[in-house]
Amino acid sequence: MWSPLILPLLAQIFACAFGDAVNEGCNVDPKGIHGLWYLDEPFGVYLSAIYNGSLAYIMMKERVPAIVTTVINSLEQDNDEIVQKYGVESQEELHRIVDSLKSLKTELSTNQPLTNLPLAHDEADRDAAVWNEHLDRQREIEGPNLSYFFTRFLLAESYTFRKMAHAFALAKNVRNFDFFGKQKEHLLTNSAKSLPILAHRALLEANRSKATKDEMREELAKFLKLSLWGNRFDLAASSGHEITQAGDPIELLSSFDEDLLIDHTRVAWDILNKPHGPNDPVIVDIVLDNAGYELFNDLCLATFLVSRGLATKVRFHAKQIPWYVSDVNIHDFHWVIGYMRSSSDPHLKEFGDLCARQLESGSWSVEADAFWTTFHGYGEMKKQAPVLYNTLSEATLLIFKGDLNYRKLLGDLNWEHTTSLDTALFHLDFKPTNVLSLRTIKARRVRRSYARDAASCGRRTRRRWATGRTGVIVASAKNAQCACAKSR
């Protein structure tokens, strides 16, 4: 359905990039990038930094280079500490990595073509060859000038983070060093005062002997909203600068309601509360976003789901490599639980022990598939990662956290604002099961057909689109005839 719109766009992009004269609709960036369009993305096209009025442009021009700079600075500042941990041979590796990241920043800021990843001599970086195959295929579609500002935003942004990780993958001693690790740990420790409050609430619900349906529905809504608003703690959106949560997050929940543009918590309740056979497992998959404070809230939600019998198993999906600054990897997941278990606060320690038991018993699991660190939208999952797609199809509810997951659900296309998530997923052929997206808005894509009037909602939020202050809890039931699909 998109080719009539995309192919002319690609032709115009090619003309802007390679034409002898500046074409109508094209211009030169003040800092020297020729061929940008001084307008927002048209509807029906992939998001791209070629549009000077877009968030994609801001991200690729300012925030992503700032993230690369932050990593360079932290490596130089922590050089002695890293060498002490990984050995004297890591010194030269760090120098090479810093040089590589500086080159990456230059390539990015000057809109150079994306190059294939050099292959390692072992299996430590297995998906590099897969990335190169996809890059070659994309060049066949877009042409040889597959550059940061002219290609799809999702490809350019993901490639930048993948290339940062690749600089370490080519090393021997610091191969497993998480260059975002300290920042992710600070996301939790900076919110230390709020953690015992949340842990206490999760424990109360886990140990509660009896609750009415109405009480359970209200508590589910609270834990979903806590998980949502924890998504404000996104280091990629803040260019890697630290963020702090203070105060009682439960008491603050009601004050955030005016910022919740779409609230489908009732749909989630109806999906999970449907009758199931005694031997039918109720699996909830959570595709994680940020480590630290947000992950802590996700653990609270998962504890509530299992302890109240709304799920028999929760499967967490993390990343294999450092990704988008604060995304959760397997180490981050276990680190948070270990942090709680070693705490002197009794509620925090008890909650950490409970989380560990849920992992040991099999009520929880944490997994990481290479697909999560590609540039593919989720409409491509069935073809690119069929095993993962089939695994997700086993779930009763599939929860996606954060802005990047939301963009991938929509194929990183600029849909009309009134397009429902149901419509987008139908056209992109992604419907493994019931889907719930918890996302604070850091871009301009929000499906508003179930929210307030789209025009007034747009006026109200335009200045806040990229701030993460507003959010959505939006559902798409697999069976549109199901009663849960009508409860929005």
Curated annotation (Swiss-Prot):
What are its cofactors? Mn(2+); Ni(2+)
Classification via Gene3D superfamilies = 1.20.930.60, Uncharacterised protein PF01937, DUF89, domain 3
Give the residue ranges of motif Subfamily III RTxK motif: 439-442
Q: Which InterPro entries match?
A: ARMT-1-like_metal-bd_sf, ARMT1, ARMT1-like_metal-bd
Modification after translation, per record: Automethylated.
Q: Where in the cell is it found?
A: Secreted
The UniProt record gives the binding positions of Mn(2+) as 289-290, 327
Keyword Magnesium present in the record's keywords: the answer is no
Q: Which positions make up the signal peptide?
A: 1-19
Q: Which GO terms describe its biological process?
A: DNA damage response; methylation
Keywords per UniProt: Hydrolase, Manganese, Metal-binding, Methyltransferase, Nickel, S-adenosyl-L-methionine, Secreted, Signal, Transferase
Q: Does the keyword Signal apply?
A: yes
User: Which residues does the record give as S-adenosyl-L-methionine binding sites?
Assistant: 294, 327
Q: Which Pfam families match?
A: ARMT1-like_dom
| Ligand binding (substrate) | 289-290, 403-407, 442
User: A Gene Ontology CC term for this entry?
Assistant: extracellular region
Q: In which tissues is it expressed?
A: Expressed by the venom gland.
Task: Give the principal location in a single coarse category.
Answer: secreted
According to its UniProt record, the EC number is: 3.1.3.-, 2.1.1.-
Q: What function does the entry list?
A: Metal-dependent phosphatase that shows phosphatase activity against several substrates, including fructose-1-phosphate and fructose-6-phosphate. Its preference for fructose-1-phosphate, a strong glycating agent that causes DNA damage rather than a canonical yeast metabolite, suggests a damage-control function in hexose phosphate metabolism. Has also been shown to have O-methyltransferase activity that methylates glutamate residues of target proteins to form gamma-glutamyl methyl ester residues. Possibly methylates PCNA, suggesting it is involved in the DNA damage response.
The entry's family comment says:
Belongs to the damage-control phosphatase family. Sugar phosphate phosphatase III subfamily.
* Free-text note on domains in this protein's UniProt record: Subfamily III proteins have a conserved RTxK motif about 40-50 residues from the C-terminus; the threonine may be replaced by serine or cysteine.
Q: What is this protein called?
A: Damage-control phosphatase ARMT1
Q: Which gene encodes it?
A: vpr2
